[in-house]
């Protein structure tokens, strides 16, 4: 610890989904100028950086995670000048900028993919093309969004791989020019003043090259934490991340502790830190997302203990409850009624008391809930619509499917940020691209700032505490009640200091006396 502590090891990062944050033009879509307009609010909260989900040119099949040009701002979000103004305004306030890099796949509208449709083009090798057997795809891998992961391309007579939507073609990282082009993208944004990168599903980029069918699952074991993934990340880090001083956080799908100990090792050879999602599957009945089940809090505590202890003094965790793909945490593990405020504070305290870099997703700091949509037409998310169509065709009732979506859809976190109780919550002067939550007149920023006992000020205090209490950055982790079904009590210790966090996940009073 003789070296200065990197800013992100005692900092807090705020995730912004720009489309739903603040509209500055009245067209119903949030934009970069809207983010700039709200920087004073973020400065008051006390965050060290903002992470922007993709604002690049995109057909918006998957809300910007289908990138058609990595180095251009989509006109829906504004201009490059708007982006440059945002960076400058944020930096003046001591707020850093983290950009989202979607490097597993591009949009099929990307110039690389358009060129790759010609078998003789040098860009053909930028993507994963394979022959099938007659009408049968190359293997039985499933797309994360439903259906087969291979799409037949009639003009060139081969299938291309898409682990996500059909319009999101997987890049071929085995081909060195692909990696060189992606390094150029990182350099471009570093030149624009970006301070960090969030790498979308980055542990899926190395595929087993014989592409075997999976007799036991959906194929993920053949491309998750794949054979060359550490080599690829070390190359990116050596050539771009380290020379440019970029903080990097990898989104790791279905990963393991052992891999993350290497991805985010303190030596810094690959990434600064990693996201994993195991803790957000404790309400998946039988491991299946599209179900309704009560969370298993004993399992939740076990997962955090495993990662807190396994990464301690070896590697770095990214801590989060919410993001643009997850339902609101106060609806999921807390309470939407009379106990919403204490539940939101409790969940914040538990997470911010751990070792790692906490991430706050927009609206989490005011205790936003799921929106309670009542019709499939209220939803915009491609994954949600695909699930509804697929399951309805299998005979599940629309009411049952809507109940599942109300608890698990990605759109639960994508409703507009409510700034006040007036029209459209102050998000837009026009019709918002997606509906607001039904309780925005009660739960909004103006109301939170006016109430000294609000969730906002609890988050503000936790952010301040992380900067002033080194124990939070460096202390160990001991679960004091690992088998208790509703009490989450843990102890952190460092250099003679002790911190005990005690939280009640139930709606009933519980008694506990620390030893």
Segments from the language model and where they lie:
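Active-site and adjacent substrate-binding regions of carbohydrate-active enzymes
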Residues: 1-514
């Amino acid at each position: 610890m003789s070296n200065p502590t990197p800013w992100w090891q005692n900092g807090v990062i705020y995730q912004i989904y720009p489309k739903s944050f603040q509209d500055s033009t009245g067209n119903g879509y949030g934009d970069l100028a809207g983010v700039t307009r709200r920087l004073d609010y973020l400065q008051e909260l006390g965050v060290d950086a903002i992470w922007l989900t993709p604002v690049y040119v995109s057909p918006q099949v998957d809300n910007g995670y289908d990138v058609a040009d990595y180095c251009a701002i989509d006109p829906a979000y504004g201009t490059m000048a708007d982006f440059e103004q945002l960076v400058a305004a944020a930096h003046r306030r001591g707020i850093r900028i983290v950009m989202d890099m979607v490097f597993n796949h591009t949009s099929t509208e990307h110039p690389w993919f358009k060129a790759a449709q010609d078998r003789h083009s040098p860009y053909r090798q930028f993507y994963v093309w394979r022959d099938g057997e007659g009408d049968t795809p190359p293997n039985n891998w499933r797309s994360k969004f439903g259906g087969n992961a291979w799409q037949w391309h009639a003009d060139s007579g081969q299938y291309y791989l898409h682990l996500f939507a059909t319009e999101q073609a997987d890049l071929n990282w085995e081909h060195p020019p692909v990696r060189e082009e992606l390094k150029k993208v990182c350099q471009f944004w570093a030149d624009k003043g970006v301070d960090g990168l969030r790498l979308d599903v980055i542990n899926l980029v190395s595929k087993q090259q014989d592409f075997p069918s999976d007799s036991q699952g959906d194929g993920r074991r053949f491309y998750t934490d794949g054979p060359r993934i550490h080599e690829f990340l070390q190359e990116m880090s050596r050539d771009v991340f380290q020379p440019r001083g970029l903080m990097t956080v990898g989104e790791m799908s279905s990963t393991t502790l052992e891999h993350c100990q290497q991805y985010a090792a303190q030596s810094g050879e690959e990434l600064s830190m990693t996201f994993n999602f195991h803790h957000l599957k404790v309400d998946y009945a039988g491991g299946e997302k599209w179900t309704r089940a009560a969370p298993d809090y004993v399992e939740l505590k076990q997962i955090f203990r495993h990662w807190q202890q396994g990464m301690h003094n070896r590697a770095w965790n990214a801590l989060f409850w919410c993001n643009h793909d997850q339902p609101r945490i106060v609806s999921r593990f807390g309470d939407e009624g009379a106990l919403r405020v204490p539940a939101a504070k409790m969940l914040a305290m538990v997470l911010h008391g751990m070792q790692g870099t906490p991430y706050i997703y927009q609206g989490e700091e005011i205790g936003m809930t799921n929106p309670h949509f009542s019709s499939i037409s209220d939803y915009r998310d491609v994954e949600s619509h695909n699930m509804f169509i697929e399951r309805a065709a299998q005979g599940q009732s629309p009411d049952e499917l809507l109940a599942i979506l109300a608890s698990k859809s990605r759109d639960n976190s994508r409703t507009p940020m409510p700034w006040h109780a007036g029209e459209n919550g102050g998000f837009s002067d026009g019709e918002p691209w997606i509906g607001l939550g039904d309780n925005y007149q009660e739960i909004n920023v103006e109301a939170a700032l006016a109430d000294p006992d609000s969730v906002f000020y609890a988050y503000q205090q936790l952010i301040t505490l992380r900067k002033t209490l080194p124990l939070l950055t460096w202390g160990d982790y001991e679960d004091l009640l690992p088998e208790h079904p509703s009490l989450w009590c843990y102890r952190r210790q460092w250099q003679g200091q002790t911190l005990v966090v005690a939280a009640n996940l139930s709606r009933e009073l519980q008694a506990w006396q620390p030893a």
